[in-house]
Amino acid sequence: MFGIVVTTIYDGAFIDAYYEHFERYGRTAEVRFYVVGDLTTPEACAERVRAYTRWGLPWFFLTPDDQRAFLSDFPALAAEIPWRSDNRRNVGFLMAYRDGCDPIISIDDDNYPTPGWDFLGEHAVTGCDVTLPVAVGSDNWFNICSMMTVDCPPLGGGQTVYPRGFPYPRRTLACGTVSATAETGRVAVNAGLWSGDPDVDAATRIVTRCATREAFTQSYLLGRGVRSPINTQNTAVMRAALPAYYYVKMGVSLAGLKLDRFGDIFSGYFVQLCAEAVGHRVRVGSPVVEHRRTPHNLYVDLWHELAGMVVLDDMLPLLETPLTPATDYGTAALELADRIEAWAAGQNGFLWGEALQDYFRNVAANLRLWVAACRQLD
């Protein structure tokens, strides 16, 4: 059964849209829905979910008390999942893992299913062997926005943009290159795309005010060793990969900046490294959701993203170096934790000091706690 995980501090209007979509495609009996509440999530959201629960659907609103009870078996990890944070989705991931959901799908509360794409049907490729053209990009980086038609009114028409978390030193037009040769691989991660307001960084959004619509007719496998940002808006992972899919905690203060809005980006890169180590692949393309972005102050977003942009450039050697081949995701994730710790210890330069090195030591420690929790649930 599919498991969908989302966290929200809004009224949950998206929930009705997903129910109607699943009804249209005859899939309401195929999915468990985990809506992870936070301290400020309105009661209207809880009631929306519970209405479907009363109909007999396995749709769950997880109250703070529900989450505390579940995490009581993992006290060290519980202490590392902050309130008033989208990091709460980690609780839903673990619950879906406990319940045997496969695949486990992460969505954001401002992304809506679209009529032309069977949301669950397209994500059903996760865990399966597929044969598809290969996205090779340039210098082992692929720009998933090249699969979309992009309109940037201030720039006078269609342009190329790059997704949030795509390193600036790797941005070239050749990053949209796709090989004519097809390959076969098992899909560990299926990264669906988004129409409307694309997931680009605040700097791009301020300059371009871009909008997107899908322009692809076929999804792709990322080439071996090829990287691309993966967010939490519309992403499925096979259950076996969840020990490597820890949503990274944000919030450290650095030189007047705050490292934020990169938790999903770091987790997406980390699971890619682990999938490669296990011999699995990442598929990019369908399904497409509509991103109805909740109100944001773009200058605040930019302030939150600047530190991540700097750190990501420094992280390139870590992300571009394969892990040792592994038989399972937990083993790969533990090696990655060691590498993160060693990499951070050797960094210096802008933003790098004890606070940032301590932060990544904490990321590595939390990844180990995450693997241990998954193994405890097995």
Residue ranges and their predicted role:
Residues 1-36:
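N-proximal low-complexity "stem/linker" segments adjacent to membrane-targeting elements
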Residues 42-101, 115-128:
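Active-site-proximal specificity loops/subdomain of glycosyltransferases
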Residues 104:
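Short aromatic/hydrophobic "clamp" motif used to bind/position activated sugar donors
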Residues 107-108, 278-289:
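Catalytic beta-strand/loop signature of glycosyltransferases that borders the donor
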Residues 110-113:
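Acidic metal-phosphate-binding loop of nucleotide-sugar-dependent transferases
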